[in-house]
């Protein structure tokens, strides 16, 4: 099968979050499964700086962006058997960052038009075209409404993956003519209109042949008013083509037996290296070096979406216990200040590292006993899977991908891979935390068994790839 991905970011070239991880890993797994895979990404200035000498020029042409003609260069490189094509236009993509400009609508309108017109020119007409989030969600609409006259594109099947429904691409309806060069008919009849705006995500949901999300629970949640971001009715209407597939993690990169960022390696049969990493981390962040105290890790953006309003409200209670917490992350200044204040009040119990450090993050995943992740909503989440890979048990709020990946501790069977609570409140966070502390202190054999189950969980991309192939084969025989 010929499969083409079109996305706004993709590791290792450009990455701001989970979308970049998916684009970096899923195509590689599909190639290993015997398929021909290509990816189209914007050619950002950070790509030029880091990978420019590995990328070759292929061709260039002009793209009509409304009444304007814009330069489009095509560049190319091959990595892990995947052919990466880049759309080059310095005016749109040399901004020093991926997102956040006032003209993001125009930037990604150009990108989508250029990606579609590039397919013929690079001679890669896919059987299946996989687009991601609102930045590329107009492509299924454009294929059926603007480029339907191109015979080579007639049989292309499309899949839209929603990584985060919060970001929908809502713009003035004038964009349809001014940038995309199409009429207002589909806006006037309500197909593309939502809240009196052009809504790219709605267009993708309606026009794509299949819609996927990054976990089964999130697929169900976005059909409710609580998580649907005002598109829940549209998703309910299209529910027959909506499904969820849990993201994977790179099992080779996140491997406690070989991780180059760790001082000591270990496996599920011998955790002595984990204990040494714990002592090393305690020393590094200025906490008393104690093997007996439970060490709790947090690696996250410090935002309300991640549940840190509830964590801050609970901290006084939690820190009355004989525990240590090491936090790594940046975000809302109010949360940054709160954690810094608590670190001063409880210097031997809380280390607040208001920054981001890849090596320190890896050490936290590997060295801690518990990993706290009480997200208000979480489409998939990767941190909890990374933590389990290293035998660090997650304590999570039961939403989205957290519900799908963390098996809550069952005290009757002594089974599970972590701890979870259903109601996001300080009371239930504290109650679940006490359950975990009791198990750690009084039932070490059961704790050890949970660690083993967590480390044996399969979150590899090869497993996720099989689910995506089932989805693709439902469209392409």
Curated annotation (Swiss-Prot):
**What superkingdom does the record give?**
Bacteria
Keyword Membrane in the entry? The reply is no
Q: Which GO terms describe its biological process?
A: glycogen biosynthetic process
One MF term from GO for this chain? Answer: alpha-1,4-glucan glucosyltransferase (UDP-glucose donor) activity
Which InterPro entries does the entry link to?
Answer: Glyco_trans_1 (IPR001296), GS/SS (IPR011835), Starch_synth_cat_dom (IPR013534)
Q: Give the EC class as a word.
A: transferase
Quote the EC number.
2.4.1.21
Q: Which UniProt keywords apply?
A: Glycogen biosynthesis, Glycosyltransferase, Transferase
- Pathway annotation from the record: Glycan biosynthesis; glycogen biosynthesis
Q: What reaction does this enzyme carry out catalytically?
A: [(1->4)-alpha-D-glucosyl](n) + ADP-alpha-D-glucose = [(1->4)-alpha-D-glucosyl](n+1) + ADP + H(+)
Where is ADP-alpha-D-glucose bound in this sequence? Answer: 15
Chloroplast as a keyword of this entry, yes or no, is no
Family listed: Belongs to the glycosyltransferase 1 family. Bacterial/plant glycogen synthase subfamily.
What is the role of the protein in this entry? Answer: Synthesizes alpha-1,4-glucan chains using ADP-glucose.
The protein's name in its UniProt record: Glycogen synthase
- Organism of origin is Streptococcus pneumoniae (strain ATCC 700669 / Spain 23F-1)
């Amino acid at each position: 099968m010929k499969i083409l991905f079109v996305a706004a970011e993709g590791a290792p070239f450009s990455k701001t979050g989970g979308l970049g991880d998916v684009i970096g890993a899923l195509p590689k797994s599909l190639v290993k499964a015997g398929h021909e895979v290509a990816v189209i990404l914007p050619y950002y200035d950070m790509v030029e700086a880091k990978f420019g000498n590995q990328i070759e020029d292929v061709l260039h042409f002009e793209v009509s962006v409304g009444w304007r003609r814009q330069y489009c260069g095509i560049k190319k490189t091959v990595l892990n058997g995947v052919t990466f094509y880049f759309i080059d236009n310095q005016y749109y993509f040399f901004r020093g960052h991926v997102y956040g400009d006032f003209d993001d609508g125009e930037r990604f309108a150009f990108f989508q038009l250029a990606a579609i017109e590039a397919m013929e020119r690079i001679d890669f007409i896919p059987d299946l075209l996989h687009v991601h989030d609102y930045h590329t969600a107009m492509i299924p609409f454009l294929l059926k409404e603007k480029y339907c006259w191109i015979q080579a594109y007639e049989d292309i099947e499309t899949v839209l993956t929603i990584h985060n429904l919060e970001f929908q691409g809502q713009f003035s309806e004038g964009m349809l003519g001014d940038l995309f060069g199409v009429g207002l008919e589909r806006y006037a009849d309500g197909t593309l209109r939502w809240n009196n705006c052009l809504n790219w995500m709605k267009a993708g949901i309606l026009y794509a042949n299949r819609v996927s999300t990054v976990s089964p629970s999130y697929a169900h949640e976005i059909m409710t008013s609580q998580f649907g971001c005002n598109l829940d009715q549209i998703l309910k209407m299209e529910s027959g083509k909506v499904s969820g597939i849990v993201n994977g993690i790179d099992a080779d990169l996140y491997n406690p037996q070989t991780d180059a960022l760790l001082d000591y390696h270990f496996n599920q049969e011998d955790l002595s290296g984990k204990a040494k990493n714990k002592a090393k981390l305690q020393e590094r962040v200025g906490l008393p070096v104690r093997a007996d105290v439970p060490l709790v890790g947090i690696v996250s953006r410090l935002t309300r979406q991640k549940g840190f309003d509830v964590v801050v409200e609970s901290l006084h209670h939690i820190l009355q216990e004989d525990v240590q917490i090491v936090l790594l992350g940046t975000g809302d200044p109010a949360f940054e200040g709160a954690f810094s204040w608590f670190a001063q009040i409880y210097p031997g119990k809380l280390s607040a590292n208001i920054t981001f450090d890849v090596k320190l993050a890896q050490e936290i995943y590997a060295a801690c006993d518990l990993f706290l992740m009480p997200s208000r909503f979480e489409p998939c989440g990767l941190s909890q899977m990374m933590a389990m890979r290293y035998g660090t048990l997650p304590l999570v709020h039961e939403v989205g991908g957290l519900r799908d990946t963390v098996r809550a501790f069952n005290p009757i069977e002594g089974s599970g891979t972590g701890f979870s609570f259903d109601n996001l409140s300080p009371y239930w966070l504290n109650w679940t935390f006490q359950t975990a502390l009791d198990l750690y202190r009084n039932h070490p054999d059961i704790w050890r068994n949970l660690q083993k189950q967590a480390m044996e969980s399969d979150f590899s991309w090869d497993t996720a790839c099989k689910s995506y192939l089932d989805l693709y084969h439902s469209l392409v025989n």
